[in-house]
Amino acid sequence: MDIQEEYMPFRAYQTYYRVVGDLRSPLTPLLLLHGGPGSTHNYFEAFDQLAMATGRPIVMYDQLGCGRSSIPTDPHLWQAATWVAELRALRAYLKLDCVHLLGQSWGGMLALIYLCDDQPRGIQSVILASTLSSAHLWAREQHRLIQFMSTTDQAAIHQAEMTGDFTTPAYLAANERFMIQHATGPITEQTPEFLRRSKRLGTAAYTTAWGPNEYFPTGTLRDYDYTAKLAQLPYPTLVTSGVNDLCTPLVAKTMVDQLPHAEWTLFPHSRHMAFIDEPAAYQARLTQWLAAHDEVTDD
């Protein structure tokens, strides 16, 4: 399977992208939007197996501010409009006239902003993976999950939120336990190489756009709420999430209830990255979904 790694000029910067397979394939490409902001494409290399098994081309990229893309120092860049413009530019640059669009976590937010505000053509289907339509609901659900932690961890998190100091050992340990429970990790020798590989995280992009952690949005995305806009989306949409996900069943169902053409698959043994926690089951469901919607066209 051919893998092409190149750079796209974007404004005064460069965006790294990675294409697995042949974009001339009769199968519609799958375009992947990673989370964060600032988490890089690396974990999406799990989808290389899908490309190899089906022949479907897959496109992934590092959004501006992380990974192998440029990491500017201008904090004003870290807002949704920048990444939407980059997504538009990438589709045009690679001539991705028709795509299946998958966004995970923040990538799903980016997808929803793009779809609702731009109403783009050529979207065969949408996959919203462990994402959200409301920052307020997300924060509320994370704090509900925190209530199931030890009283010591709850106190450390509460203290950090009250003081704005997210550097204490007690808080850092509590946050790590929370993320292992609901997101990803720990990293071991058995962890796939693409997850163990060092990467340039977009820390500035994350903290400026979202906040200090998953449950305390304070950045430019803090008022994000597209729930009421979901009803206008005409695209077939698959929502995926895990039972132990940051994207709780309430967060996922809130989207499903508003989307007019949605299906929801809840993975019973997964956290925030079901394609990592249950790769075979996720690949099977996604392969089925993509094949079923390849013939849908944007008239």
Swiss-Prot record:
Identify one Gene Ontology CC term for this UniProt entry. membrane
Instruction: Provide the active-site residues from the annotation.
Output: 105, 245, 272
Protease recorded as keyword: yes
One Pfam match, given by its short name, reads: Abhydrolase_1
Q: Which residues form the signal peptide?
A: none
Q: Which reaction does it catalyse?
A: Release of N-terminal proline from a peptide
Q: Which GO terms describe its biological process?
A: proteolysis
Query: So what EC number does this one have?
Result: 3.4.11.5
List where in the cell it is found.
Cell envelope
Q: What does this protein do?
A: Releases the N-terminal proline from various substrates.
Database matches in NCBIfam families: pro_imino_pep_2, ProImpepLactob
Q: What family is reported?
A: Belongs to the peptidase S33 family.
Q: Write the protein's name.
A: Proline iminopeptidase
**Source species:** Levilactobacillus brevis (strain ATCC 367 / BCRC 12310 / CIP 105137 / JCM 1170 / LMG 11437 / NCIMB 947 / NCTC 947) (Lactobacillus brevis)
